[in-house]
A protein has these predicted regions:
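A conserved pocket-lining segment of Rossmann-fold NAD(P)-dependent short-chain dehydrogenase/reductase
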Residues: 85-86, 146-150, 191-204, 212-236
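C-terminal substrate-binding subdomain of Rossmann-fold SDR/epimerase-dehydratase oxidoreductases
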Residues: 221, 226-229, 234-341
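N-terminal Rossmann NAD(P)H-binding glycine-rich loop of SDR-like oxidoreductase domains
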Residues: 7-27
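Conserved Rossmann-fold NAD(P)-dependent oxidoreductase catalytic core, especially the SDR/UDP-sugar
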Residues: 101-154
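Active-site Tyr-X1-5-Lys
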Residues: 150-187
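Rossmann-fold cofactor-recognition segment
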Residues: 46-58
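NAD(P)H-binding glycine-rich loop region in Rossmannoid oxidoreductase-like domains
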Residues: 56-95
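Glycine/proline-rich active-site loop of Rossmann-fold NAD(P)-dependent oxidoreductases
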Residues: 160, 183, 195-211, 238-239, ...
Length: 341
């Protein structure tokens, strides 16, 4: 029986998965196979050619996917995220690293079967960085892809490990094997900054104070921010993040000089965000009550990242700067969601 051609999206029921699947469906060029450990929301499932519920650690599941589908590209979004990973670090490592290894193996097998390199799109994270102290962070300025890679969290370490695994599978896979048996995938990773969404209620992620602040204000609730007012890290909106993945996917391989790229759109302090929120929702109470442990993690992340390589290689250009993020995306949508004025 002929296999059905599909683009695989793992973590399909997450926020980025939802947005990516909608965009892939709009493009009309792809049949999407959605995979998640939970049942995929009906609205998203309707946009997929097929949906599967299962665990990326289940090698039998991976084998079944390969037996039924010809997978032309992989968007591997499934992960245990940063805050949760600190509570269950061993389990996070299993999912984030071994799960990724299972998907890389799938991509290698499909590369052999199809006779061409299967694209593997991987969302990495600013958590891959680790600056030793606040003074160094402030002096470092915009950090390139190859600096300060000493993460202090399990999630960051997992993401950095997977970047290296992807580079190996792309450039050095089975390098001592006979040439006819060797073959590399087309691995492409984006190191995302903090992501801000108008549509999903924040889930306690390390950079979620930005989204939490906006969603609380739109509901008229006071918000105690868990970081210092002067805390600065880079951010971008979720639509810009999804567009970055799609743009990188379409980039000609000969244009790419790296397997890992920084992206970012704006780099406000927590105080800048609070003032912007209070301008939109006058009278809302925003205070600062830093959590020392989460603050220490954020202080290890750069104030900004150098995106020049992404701009030069594949034309990365975010739509939303800080003002446009608020005026065109965040405020209209959170007001609609909560009935705020």
């Amino acid at each position: 029986m002929a296999r059905k051609t599909a683009v695989l999206v793992t973590g399909a029921n997450g926020e980025m998965g939802h947005g990516l699947i909608h965009r892939l469906a709009e493009l009309g060029s792809f049949d999407v196979l959605g995979l998640d450990i939970r049942s995929i929301d009906a609205e998203v499932a309707q946009r997929c050619a097929a949906t599967w519920v299962g665990d990326i650690l289940d090698r039998r599941l991976i084998d079944r996917l390969m037996s039924e589908f010809e997978i032309s590209a992989v968007f591997h979004l499934a992960a245990v995220l940063s805050t949760r990973a600190e509570f269950v670090p061993e389990a996070a490592h299993e999912v984030n690293v071994q799960g990724t290894l299972n998907l890389l193996h799938l991509a290698v097998e499909e590369t052999r079967s199809l006779g061409r390199a299967v694209k593997f799109l991987f969302p990495s994270s600013i958590a891959a960085y680790g600056l030793p102290d606040l003074a160094t962070k402030r002096a470092a300025g915009r950090v390139t892809e190859h600096e300060w890679l000493m993460p202090v969290t399990m999630y960051g370490g997992n993401k950095l490990s997977c970047e290296h695994l992807g580079r190996y599978f792309a450039r050095h896979y089975r390098q001592l094997a006979p040439q006819t048996d060797a073959g590399g995938i087309d691995f492409r990773a984006i190191r995302f900054p903090g992501l801000i969404s108008a549509f999903t209620v924040p889930s306690g992620g390390t950079s979620d104070y930005a989204s939490e602040m906006i969603h609380a204000a739109a509901q008229g609730r006071p918000y105690a921010c868990f970081v210092r007012e002067d805390t600065r890290i880079p951010f971008m909106t979720m639509p810009d993040a999804i567009q970055a993945l799609l743009t990188l996917m379409e980039a000609p391989p000969e244009r790419l000089t790296s397997v890992v790229y920084n992206v970012s759109a704006f780099s406000p302090t927590a105080g800048d965000l609070a003032r912007r929120v209070q301008r939109a929702f006058p009278g809302v109470a925003i205070s600062f009550a830093p959590d020392p442990r989460r603050q220490a993690i954020l202080d290890s992340w750069p104030e900004d990242v150098d995106v020049s390589r992404a701009r030069a290689d594949w034309g990365f250009t975010p739509t939303h700067d800080l003002d446009r993020a608020f005026d065109e995306y965040l405020l209209p949508n959170v007001r609609r969601r909560y009935g705020a004025r």
